[in-house]
């Protein structure tokens, strides 16, 4: 089970949203690169970054902050938010991003995702409201079921699936384990849970869910619900 801390970027600052609403943004740091460095010191191996402005704009909007984060740490980085074309993917890969997250474009142009997965390390981000896929910074909800989209990529060489129940995101109410496991089973891929993690006690339960291999830690860390340093030490030796 991979424990992945998250940094969501809005206008160069590290923030957290509630249920994907930009107006709910709470600022946690003006220096996201310092956060990244601290996550590495605590024992993290991966870092999850979302360019929130980019997710709404459909193009990179926090490039300088992302570059500084990359320069400040040796963590592996997965990044999403507004990535719609190969030129942007190349730009991030050249910057040193290890895994590219494709979200909105996965619903709107799955053939593009399949093509990119043959060339780059790609994760598909499946974000859902009431079981249906949401896109464009979660501002749009389509008619595609999340499990159907996951199944569509079953034979595609993806690096991971990252799934979020938007109704749980940023609420500290607990991750929707049933939804996460359904996505994992439908896709057959390494699956990372996201949205609503409330406490350390949830993590062993997620680890027991078939096909769920990682979890993203966001607001639970920033609000002091989870001590990442202690968690990494506790899990070493019993969870990979």
Curated annotation (Swiss-Prot):
EC number: 5.3.1.16
Active site: 8 (proton acceptor), 127 (proton donor)
Any single GO CC term annotated in Swiss-Prot or TrEMBL for this entry: cytoplasm
GO molecular function, one term: 1-(5-phosphoribosyl)-5-[(5-phosphoribosylamino)methylideneamino]imidazole-4-carboxamide isomerase activity
Cell compartment(s), UniProt: Cytoplasm
A GO biological-process term: L-histidine biosynthetic process
Catalytic activity field: 1-(5-phospho-beta-D-ribosyl)-5-[(5-phospho-beta-D-ribosylamino)methylideneamino]imidazole-4-carboxamide = 5-[(5-phospho-1-deoxy-D-ribulos-1-ylimino)methylamino]-1-(5-phospho-beta-D-ribosyl)imidazole-4-carboxamide
Top enzyme category: isomerase
Pathway: Amino-acid biosynthesis; L-histidine biosynthesis; L-histidine from 5-phospho-alpha-D-ribose 1-diphosphate: step 4/9
Keywords linked to the UniProt accession: Amino-acid biosynthesis, Cytoplasm, Histidine biosynthesis, Isomerase
Primary localisation category: cytoplasm
InterPro entries attached to this UniProt entry: Aldolase_TIM (IPR013785), His_biosynth (IPR006062), HisA_bact_arch (IPR006063), Isoase_HisA-like (IPR044524), Isoase_HisA-like_bact (IPR023016), RibuloseP-bd_barrel (IPR011060)
Origin: domain of life: Bacteria
Keyword Cytoplasm annotated: yes
Annotated HAMAP family: HisA (MF_01014)
Family the entry assigns: Belongs to the HisA/HisF family.
PANTHER family registered for this protein in UniProt: 1-(5-PHOSPHORIBOSYL)-5-[(5-PHOSPHORIBOSYLAMINO)METHYLIDENEAMINO] IMIDAZOLE-4-CARBOXAMIDE ISOMERASE
The protein, known as: 1-(5-phosphoribosyl)-5-[(5-phosphoribosylamino)methylideneamino] imidazole-4-carboxamide isomerase
């Amino acid at each position: 089970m991979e424990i992945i801390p998250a940094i969501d970027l809005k206008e160069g600052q590290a923030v957290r949203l509630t249920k994907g609403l930009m107006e709910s943004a709470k600022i946690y740091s003006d220096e996201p690169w310092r956060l990244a460095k601290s996550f590495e010191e605590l024992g993290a191996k991966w870092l999850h970054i979302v360019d929130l402005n980019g997710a709404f704009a459909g193009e990179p909007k926090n490039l300088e902050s992302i570059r500084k984060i990359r320069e400040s740490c040796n963590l592996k980085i997965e990044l999403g938010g507004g990535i719609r074309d190969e030129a942007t993917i190349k730009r991030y890969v050249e910057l040193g991003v290890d895994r590219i997250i494709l979200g909105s474009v996965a619903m709107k142009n799955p053939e593009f995702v399949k093509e990119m997965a043959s060339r780059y390390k790609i994760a598909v981000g499946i974000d859902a409201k009431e079981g249906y896929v949401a896109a464009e910074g979660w501002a749009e909800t389509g008619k595609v079921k999340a499990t159907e989209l996951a199944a569509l990529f079953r034979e595609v060489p993806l690096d991971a699936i990252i799934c979020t129940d938007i109704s749980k995101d940023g609420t500290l109410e607990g991750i929707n384990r049933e939804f996460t496991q359904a996505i994992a089973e439908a896709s057959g891929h390494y699956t990372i849970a996201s949205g609503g993690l409330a406490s350390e006690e949830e993590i062993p339960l997620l680890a027991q869910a078939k096909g769920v291999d990682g979890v993203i830690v966001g607001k639970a860390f920033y609000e002091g619900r989870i001590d990442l340093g202690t968690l990494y030490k506790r899990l070493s030796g019993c969870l990979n």
